[in-house]
From Swiss-Prot:
PROSITE patterns named in the record: ACTINS_1, ACTINS_2, ACTINS_ACT_LIKE
Positions of the propeptide segment: 1-2
PANTHER family per the UniProt record, alphabetical: ACTIN
Enzyme Commission (EC) number: 3.6.4.-
UniProt main location, coarse: cytoplasm
CC terms in the record's Gene Ontology section: cytoplasm; cytoskeleton
In-chain residues carrying the UniProt-annotated modification N-acetylaspartate: 3
Compartment(s): Cytoplasm, Cytoskeleton
Protein name per UniProt: Actin-2
Similarity annotation: Belongs to the actin family.
GO MF term (any one): ATP binding
Superkingdom per UniProt: Eukaryota
Length: 376
């Protein structure tokens, strides 16, 4: 019997992108936007096979005629009907597997409400009839992917940013900090500052264009004030971008002003600490004996840590906050966009993990609350 039959499925449901594939693989097979789109207009062409909803890339490509909704906001599922559509799409259209034949490993945001984990568990067993499932915390998986069991993970995706200190494989819940500032907010901010340049982006479809500009052109300045001065005095930092209709726009200091909001949330009118300070605060909430290990293992994870220059800037900012003799190391793996998924793939293929799955039988005996006993 070939082991492909029983390979576990690993599904990392991010606020912006859904990553899915088979345990044991080194990268997800399917990566698509966590979007459900519904037509804004009446269908007039009979027999066109128009659907009442589109998911993922198809929704993205037809975005001009759709209203796009993200069922996961700030890392937490807010619309279960749409979430079910995304899972259905993942299993049947992307991976082309029958979920009732494979154990499924799902991921969740740290500090996820209890009711949410129960609902995920319920849908997996009752709607998709999976034989077994497990819910793992995203940041912990990122740490596994970097080959560590101790460290502090700064996980910043599209919907939420967390700093999660982990010691010997255990997340320390009292020291986890959450910042509701991530990729989507940066996209919105870039929309706003591009508007000041006279380019107007307003619809949900245009927001996706701005997201692309952000991903292709933005970077983090090592010294913000100095970079602003450089941008003001010369055009060396300007880049051009071609919009889908052929119009070319010029982007200047917006390139680093946009991600600067991660370090200075006041740019977005938020009163919270930046990612460097949040990381520091998280470390300071931990036991004094383990701080040294955390400072030396700062792991970056998630798509919003992909900006060029972010690791150097974090190094500089945390060095300024930490005790002067402390050794500080920022680990920024090149595949960190997918490190949660990769960690899930590693975890689900460990032989020692096989007794950790929640089986259908256990679910039938205990109900959805079993998830709190088995997954921690």
């Amino acid at each position: 019997m070939c082991d492909e039959e029983v390979a576990a499925l690993v599904v990392d449901n991010g606020s912006g992108m859904c990553k899915a594939g088979f345990a044991g693989d080194d990268a997800p097979r399917a990566v698509f936007p966590s979007i459900v789109g519904r037509p804004r207009h009446q269908g007039v062409m009979v027999g066109m096979g128009q659907k009442d909803s589109y998911v993922g890339d198809e929704a993205q490509s037809k975005r001009g005629i759709l209203t796009l909704k993200y069922p996961i906001e700030h890392g937490i599922v807010t619309n279960w009907d749409d979430m079910e559509k995304i899972w259905h799409h993942t299993f049947y259209n992307e991976l082309r597997v029958a979920p009732e034949e494979h154990p499924v490993l799902l991921t969740e945001a740290p500090l996820n409400p209890k009711a949410n984990r129960e609902k995920m568990t319920q849908i997996m067993f009752e709607t998709f009839n999976t034989p077994a499932m497990y819910v793992a915390i995203q940041a912990v998986l990122s740490l596994y992917a970097s080959g560590r069991t101790t460290g502090i993970v700064l996980d910043s995706g599209d919907g939420v940013t967390h700093t999660v200190p982990i010691y010997e494989g255990y997340a320390l819940p009292h020291a986890i900090l959450r910042l509701d500032l991530a990729g989507r907010d940066l996209t919105d901010y870039l929309m706003k500052i591009l508007t000041e340049r006279g380019y107007s982006f307003t619809t949900t479809a245009e927001r996706e264009i701005v997201r692309d500009i952000k991903e292709k052109l933005c970077y983090v300045a090592l010294d913000f004030e100095q970079e602003m001065a450089t941008a003001a005095s010369s055009s060396s930092l300007e880049k051009s971008y071609e919009l889908p209709d052929g119009q070319v726009i010029t982007v200047g200091n917006e390139r680093f002003r946009c991600p600067e909001a991660l370090f200075q949330p006041s740019f977005l009118g938020m009163e919270s600490a930046g990612i460097h300070e949040t990381t520091y605060n998280s470390i300071m909430k931990c036991d004094i004996d383990i701080r040294k290990d955390l400072y030396a293992n700062n792991v970056l994870s998630g798509g919003s840590t992909m900006y060029p220059g972010i690791a150097d800037r974090m190094q500089k900012e945390i060095t300024a906050l930490a005790p002067s003799t402390m050794k500080i190391k920022i680990i920024a793996p090149p595949e960190r966009k997918y490190s949660v998924w990769i960690g899930g793939s590693i975890l689900a293929s460990l032989s020692t993990f096989q007794q950790m799955w929640i089986s259908k039988q256990e679910y039938d005996e205990s109900g959805p609350s079993i998830v709190h006993r088995k997954c921690f």
